[in-house]
Amino acid sequence: MERMEQFDVAIVGAGPTGLACGIELERRGLKPVLFDKGCVLNSLYHYPINLVFFTTPELLEIGDIPMTSLNEKPGRTEALKYYRRVADHYKLNIHQYERVLDFDGSDGHFTVRTEKTCYRAGKIILASGYYDIPNKLKVPGEDLDKVIHYYREAHPYYNQDVVVVGAKNSAAIGALELFWTGARVTMVVRGAGIDAGVKYWIKPNIENRIKCGEIKAYFQSTVKEIREHDVVIQTPDSEVAIKNDFVFAMTGYRPDFEFMAAHGIHLDPETSKPITDPQTLESERPGVYLAGVIVAGTHTNEIFIENGRFHGRLIAEAITQKLTEPQT
């Protein structure tokens, strides 16, 4: 039987938080390995192409390597380039396109099974983010090809009838870019208006487009059914069928709670937050740690790159301390 490769720590997820964990472990002389089902920075890669971060470069930095930007706020492409450079600098061992299927064992003696093979690891860090699983509308027709949960760019939807579901940042930005590119945009919003948390330079813009009728909006309304050539919505007054070519269901995303629960990670029944030690981010399953936005459960607006990047240091210090404690 082929001998399994051994690592001190296996990190599930190679986004900014996963990279930060790998860096801090390397700095302490440990041997980590990172796995991602897609490319390195897979979620960031799938962000809208023209995305601009609502932050300054220094707040995205990891590994004490400066990040520079042409503008006050960095964009997606600059962030991808920066994090690749950091990964190269620290020579991180990243297994791209290798999904982790499961892991078993106990603290110090885990077996990690991927699509390709199995590995040994002393500790596990789950840093898989939340961008992989969209919150579904749960309506008939959602499985049609014209329904899109990830907005990337507007060009393919020129001169098309487009419905945007939602009213937070991704929905507002997507609706504006689609409108500017020549799509006929209708927004369907569950609440009474555009979300108060929308970026300050976006919110008045989208509200003005709606006010002057350039973008149609149905507030306090929900999607009932998606059909090949239209979308049926329920408004406060009646059902309305909207002519439609594409639907952008910008209803948010969530971590893979099922994977966590299946691997002994207990979740808070109200918030779905994993139960962790706040000082170490170790879960109730010894040897399994959580990092980044998955720590926030369904409250995904509580943790961003800006604060999740510090989880790596916290976890690495905890792991190092455990490994150096005298055995009793």
Model-identified regions with their sequence ranges:
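Residues at the starts of beta-strands that form the adenosine-phosphate
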Residues: 8, 31, 161, 183-186, ...
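A Rossmann-like FAD-binding core segment of flavoenzymes
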Residues: 94-112, 118-119, 180-271, 327-328
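FAD-site-proximal beta/loop scaffold in flavoenzymes
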Residues: 142-156, 253-302
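AMP-binding/adenylate-forming core of the ANL superfamily
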Residues: 124, 245-248, 289
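A conserved FAD-binding loop/helix module that cradles the flavin
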Residues: 292-328
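Predominantly flavin-linked oxidoreductase catalytic cores and closely associated redox partners
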Residues: 105, 117-202
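Beta1/beta-strand and adjacent pyrophosphate-binding region of the FAD-binding site
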Residues: 3-17, 160-165
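Beta1-alpha1 glycine-rich phosphate/pyrophosphate-binding loop at the start
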Residues: 14-92, 172-200, 269-270
